[in-house]
């Protein structure tokens, strides 16, 4: 088989139905064999009923897989193991794909030039950003699961988001699966499992392609346009970054197991936050403070855990 689309889901049966409907409407050449694998990560709602309904209505196109171990990365890795395609594409259960999405995203992956590809993720509806949102900082759009590198195709220099990405399956054989200490799970919203994998293969020298014509629509609910959502997201991102990259290379001195350099950066960005006049600039600095706070918390936990193991 040429392509497997993996869609992991947890307790979102209503948005899942919309996502599957958009996948059923995909237009690909008749010579391309493809499937959609719905990985149910221990949902308690009507997820299985919805998925199996699509399997009956579209025999051979949709499959259902139950993964009982909580955590999105566990579900992703289970889907990869069970996939039949030589190319694996990913989309989220609250997103919808334009009819040409899968064809545009994967068309360049049938050869050996590209290891993977990423497409654009755009808001499902027009949204108005608040005054405090810094519109000239593309990194902040990732908070809303939005992604764009412009309208021209070409090589990717940054990892795409899991809502709209694809890889040749051999990349997982070569570089491993998604890290299970990253990715949302019960009791934790630490993310980054998708960008960590993309960054891992880019760091290894593999090439990824940006396909702006591969478009996924993602909802942006009003609660995601609140300051608290951004602050929580970037705090968790700081924790994720420490798990990915560990102690900073410039760390020489430590306080309670935390690199002193992190406290210096925290003080610097706190001062910039206090002194900034522009609402957007102030909030941008504040997000940096929250990110560093997340790194410090995770660094402290890591150091405390290491001391406990050593003492025992």
Kindly give the residue locations of the regions a language model identified:
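Non-catalytic, C-terminal membrane-associated alpha-helical segments of glycosyltransferases
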Residues: 232-239, 246-312
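Conserved donor NDP-sugar-binding/catalytic core segment of glycosyltransferases
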Residues: 100-133
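Short, flexible, basic/aromatic active-site loop/helix in glycosyltransferases
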Residues: 136-158
């Amino acid at each position: 088989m040429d392509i497997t689309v993996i869609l992991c889901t947890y307790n979102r049966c209503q948005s899942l139905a919309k996502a599957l409907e958009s996948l059923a409407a995909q237009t690909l050449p008749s010579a391309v064999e493809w499937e959609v694998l719905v990985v149910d990560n221990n949902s308690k709602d009507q997820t299985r009923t919805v998925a199996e309904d699509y399997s009956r209505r579209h025999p051979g196109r949709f499959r259902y897989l139950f993964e009982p171990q909580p955590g999105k990365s566990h579900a992703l890795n289970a889907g990869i193991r069970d996939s039949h395609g030589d190319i694996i594409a990913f989309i989220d259960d609250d997103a919808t794909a334009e009819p040409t999405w899968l064809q545009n995203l994967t068309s360049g992956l049938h050869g050996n030039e590209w290891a993977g590809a990423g497409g654009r993720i755009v808001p499902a509806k027009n949204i108005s950003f608040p005054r405090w949102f810094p519109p000239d900082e593309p990194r902040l759009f990732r908070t809303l699961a939005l992604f764009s590198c412009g309208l021209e195709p070409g090589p990717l220099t940054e990892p795409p988001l899991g809502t709209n990405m694809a890889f040749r399956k051999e990349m997982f054989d070569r570089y491993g699966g998604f890290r299970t200490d990253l990715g949302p799970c019960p009791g934790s919203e630490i993310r980054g499992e998708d960008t960590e994998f993309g960054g891992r293969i880019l760091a290894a020298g593999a090439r990824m392609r940006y396909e702006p014509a591969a478009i996924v629509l993602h909802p942006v609910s009003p609660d995601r346009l609140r300051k608290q959502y951004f602050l929580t997201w970037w705090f968790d991102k700081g924790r994720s970054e420490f798990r990915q990259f560990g102690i900073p290379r410039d760390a020489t001195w430590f306080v309670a197991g935390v690199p002193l350099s992190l406290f210096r950066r925290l003080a610097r960005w706190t001062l910039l936050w206090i002194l900034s006049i522009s609402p957007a600039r102030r909030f941008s600095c504040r997000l940096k403070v929250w990110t560093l706070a997340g790194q410090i918390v995770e660094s402290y936990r890591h150091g405390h855990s290491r001391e406990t193991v050593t003492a025992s």
